[in-house]
Regions:
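Short, proline-centered helix/strand-breaking motifs
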Residues: 174-178
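Short beta-strand His + acidic residue motifs that chelate non-heme Fe in jelly-roll/DSBH
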Residues: 103-106, 181-189
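Catalytic core of non-heme Fe(II) oxygenases with the double-stranded beta-helix
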Residues: 95-172, 193, 207-215
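Short beta-strand segments enriched in hydrophobic/aromatic residues
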Residues: 119, 179, 201-203
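Residue-level recognition of well-ordered beta-strand positions that form the cores
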Residues: 16, 94, 116-118, 198-200
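A short glycine-rich, His/Asp/Glu-containing loop-to-beta-strand
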Residues: 87-95
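Non-heme Fe(II)/2-oxoglutarate
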Residues: 1-83, 92, 102, 193-226
Length: 226
């Protein structure tokens, strides 16, 4: 007789926006403001077109609902103290119009939490894949990287180096910004447009909780030097 204890998991939150169809229609009403068409920008608009979708006032209800999910993730799931305000610092589009429109491994180094809100996901849409940051259960170097022979009988949550989610429209996925991730095609027959709003979040200490050393202070206390 024995037991196994899984310690120190990486927690990803998957939710669904209740007012998705309303938010989707509102977004398409203003889509032309963010509709980049240059082929080199087809995968993401970050740093090339517009990274501040959250500042569009007509989308306030969308981002307010996103923030409700972020607070559930922080306070209900991860069980942090309610001493933080949520600040969205950047938001941009992720688009795939063909199977090869994939995003390479990366993380978001300037934020605490990142989110993906899926506006549209046609059949065979790209998945989002996450990389195991530690993989202590990999008993041999390169155990999860071989594409020819593997010593693992069945891949599961204990021995895998990657994990993927096939999101549906209306889903919101939240994860630590430091977690490496990518998008990956699931079929060469993908057609249509997979469209998601991606965003970065920092946690800012509330005015009555500035005595904590963890967390940013409100940007009103910052001073810009140039």
């Amino acid at each position: 007789m024995y037991q196994t204890i899984n310690i120190f998991p990486t927690t990803i939150y998957v939710g669904e926006l209740e007012n998705h169809l309303q938010h989707k229609n509102k977004f398409y009403d203003v889509d032309s403001e963010f509709n980049y068409r240059n082929s080199q920008w087809d995968v993401t608009s970050e740093n090339t077109f517009d990274s501040f979708i959250h500042l569009n006032q007509s989308l306030d209800s969308l981002f307010s609902e996103i923030v409700l999910h972020i607070k559930k993730y922080i306070f209900d799931v991860l069980e942090y103290k309610d001493i933080f305000d949520v600040v969205i610092t950047k938001s941009w589009l992720s688009r795939a119009r063909q199977a090869e429109d994939q995003i390479k491994w990366h993380n978001h180094s300037t934020s605490h939490i990142s989110f993906s809100y899926y506006i549209d996901t046609p059949p065979n849409s790209h998945c989002i894949k996450f990389l195991n940051p530690h993989n202590f259960n990999s008993l041999f170097a390169g155990n999860n990287t071989s594409t020819i022979k593997s010593s693992i009988e069945n891949y599961n949550e204990f021995n895998s180096s990657t994990f993927h989610i096939n999101p549906k429209q209306g889903n919101i996925i939240l994860f630590p910004s430091s977690l490496r991730h990518r998008t990956e095609k699931v079929s060469d027959s993908f057609k249509g447009e997979r469209l998601a709003i991606i965003g970065d979040v920092i946690l800012v200490l509330k005015e009555n909780n500035l005595g904590y050393s963890q967390g940013y202070v409100n940007p009103k206390y910052w001073k810009l030097y140039s």
